[in-house]
Structure formats: structure tokens, C-alpha cells
Amino acid sequence: MASKQHAHILSLARSMIPPLHPKLHKGQAGRIGVLGGSGDYSGAPYFSSMGAMRFGADLAHVICEPSAGAVIKTYSPDLIVHTILDPQKSREDIRSALKGVMSRLHVLIIGPGLGRDDHMQSCAKIAFELAKDMEQMGVVVDADGLWLVQNEPKVVMDWPGVPRIILTPNVMEFKRLCDTMKINASGPHTSLCPQLATALGNATIIQKGPSDIISNGLKIPSALLSDESEEQNYLEVKVEGGLKRVGGQGDILSGSTGVLLAWGSEWVRGTYEHVGHPPPQDKAIAENIPVLAAYGASTFNRTVSKRGFQKKGRSMVTGDLVDMVGEVYEEVFGKPGEMEGRGKL
């Protein structure tokens, strides 16, 4: 993608970021939930939620199974941990508890550390059902949340209005989703993401790979494209990433994606208008917040991966990336007060 095109879309993504302002109260700059954390996996929900906090969210909640929660609570006092996915509780008790927590969130990230056992998959399905009925709830799906989508694709389909959902599959997860939806995965790689997004009800997809392909299956509106661009139904992020493929990098992506989706959605609702950041006047921008969030998060995640690899080489682990989120955020999006690059909307 030409640098002019990349700069234009990134400036639009930057426009979603709320200012740091004394008139904003705690929680208005992002209340993010991560549904995951099971008997076998406690690291992934930590990386996703702490990545979201380091990226700029005000609050991060982890919704998990009790044994995972006991461990996650020791990782950081900054996280709010809800151990409500208890296999000893009834489905209705879990639904009620989940509804109470989710009603406080802007975005729910489903999948980090979720696992594939029947109980945790059932909890994820309940969360999808609740989110679909919450008009202002955004959803990001990763890891074993995608396993549920593969087996029950209807959980991400038929959302009212503009689908407020972003999927972040890696190569194998993407192939399995294509198989489920009967899409020939041997076609041109830039055509597959739009096909899958269309089949899944126009959910936005980040198809992770050597470059990241982003699509909701629809034509990209001209407002998102530079003058030199041809008509297309996908965006491609070619920003260089790191060479170390370490477990947990996708959790950093899901966290940053969730924050940008929350910021963009609140921007459109006018939450930041009283601090000099009015909602976009262009309807095409307002209707493509998930696409812009995906593009900004992909650019950020590839950059933090590159910086981590440059610093640590083969020894790089995801904990190194969490520590670098703040500085790479400023590299990609600018420091507070250095926002002259916002898109003109």
C-alpha cells in the first residue's frame, strides 16, 4: 500500500482517540473486558487486558474461571478480575453474572485463554448472545473464541445495525473459518478476507499474515481512501513486523483493537464532544469504525513486534512487548498534544 494511502487511513484512525482532558471522568476513555482464562491458560487474558491498559484504556476487566482468576490476580493489581465462569454454577447464574459485568463495558474481547472445553465454550456463547442485545457493545474475537465461531458461525451473524465485531484470526484459524463457510482458501489471498467477512454477516476481519488484510466484505468508502486509490473491498497493512513468532502477540493485538473500537464508538456517540472532540460528520467514517480500529491496531501491533525483536532478538517474549506498548503507541499515534495529524472529518 502506498505510503500516502497508509498515512491517510492512519490519520483517520488517530481521529478516534479521545483527548486527555480534565473534564473526562474515569471510564470514559475505555472500559474493556476480556472473557477468557481457564484451567490451562492464565497468561493470554493478562496480556490482552494489560495490553489494553498500557494502550490507554481506563479500566480492564478479566472474566474468567475461578482457578485462572486466582493466578491472574497475582499478575497485576491494575486488573479487575471476575471469577464468574464457574463450572459449578448453573447456566442461568452465569448468564446473570455476565450480564451485570458486561453492562459496564464498552468492548468485550472473547477468546484469550478461553480453552475449548464445553463449559468455557458455552460461557463464550452466552457472552455473544448478551452482546448482540446490547446496542452499544463492541466485540473482538480471538483465539478459542474463533473456535466457537468456527463451530457455530451464527454467533457473529445477524447483528442489528452496523456489525460491531472484529475477528483476528491467524493463518490456521482463518483457514478453518474458510472451510466452515465453504470458501476455497486456495484463491488470491486478498480476495479471501472479503469473502469470509461477507459470509460472516459483514463482521470486520483482520487476516493476520506476512501482511494483514482487513475487510468487512463491503466496498471501502472513498472517505477512507486517498485520491490515488482504486476501488477496493479490503485494506492491506504492510508495516514491517518482527521475525520472532511468540505466543501472546495476538493477545496484544486483541487488546489494542478493543481499545480503538471503544474509542471510535464513543467518539461517534458524542461522548467527547464536550471536550472539543465532536463526532465525525461523514457517515461513511461513522459506519466504518471497526475497519479503522482494525487498521490502527494492526499497524500498532506489527510495529511493537518489530521494536521488541530489534531489542530482544530471539529471546523476545510477550512480556517484553507489554512493557513497550506505551512508547510504540506514541511512535504510531503521537504523544498527547501532538495530534495535528488527525483526519479532517
Curated annotation (Swiss-Prot):
Q: Which residues bind ATP?
A: 208-212, 241-250
For this UniProt record, the keywords arranged alphabetically read as follows: ATP-binding, Cytoplasm, Lyase, NAD, NADP, Nucleotide-binding, Phosphoprotein
Record has Amino-acid biosynthesis as a keyword: no
Listed transmembrane segments = none
Instruction: Please give the Pfam families that the UniProt record associates with this protein.
Output: Carb_kinase
Compartments, record wording = Cytoplasm
Question: Where on this chain does (6S)-NADPHX bind?
Answer: 113, 170-176, 251
- Identify a single GO molecular function assigned to this protein: ATP binding
Write down the Gene3D superfamilies for this protein, in alphabetical order: 3.40.1190.20
The cofactor required is: Mg(2+)
YjeF C-terminal domain location is: 9-332
Q: Write out the GO cellular component annotations.
A: cytoplasm
Q: Does the keyword Zinc apply?
A: no
- CDD domains, per this entry? YXKO-related
Q: What does this protein do?
A: Catalyzes the dehydration of the S-form of NAD(P)HX at the expense of ATP, which is converted to ADP. Together with NAD(P)HX epimerase, which catalyzes the epimerization of the S- and R-forms, the enzyme allows the repair of both epimers of NAD(P)HX, a damaged form of NAD(P)H that is a result of enzymatic or heat-dependent hydration.
Q: Which HAMAP family match?
A: NADHX_dehydratase (MF_01965)
The protein's matches in NCBIfam families, at most eight in alphabetical order, are given as: yjeF_cterm (TIGR00196)
Write the protein's name: ATP-dependent (S)-NAD(P)H-hydrate dehydratase
Annotated source species = Cryptococcus neoformans var. neoformans serotype D (strain JEC21 / ATCC MYA-565) (Filobasidiella neoformans)
Q: What is the lineage of its organism?
A: Eukaryota, Fungi, Dikarya, Basidiomycota, Agaricomycotina
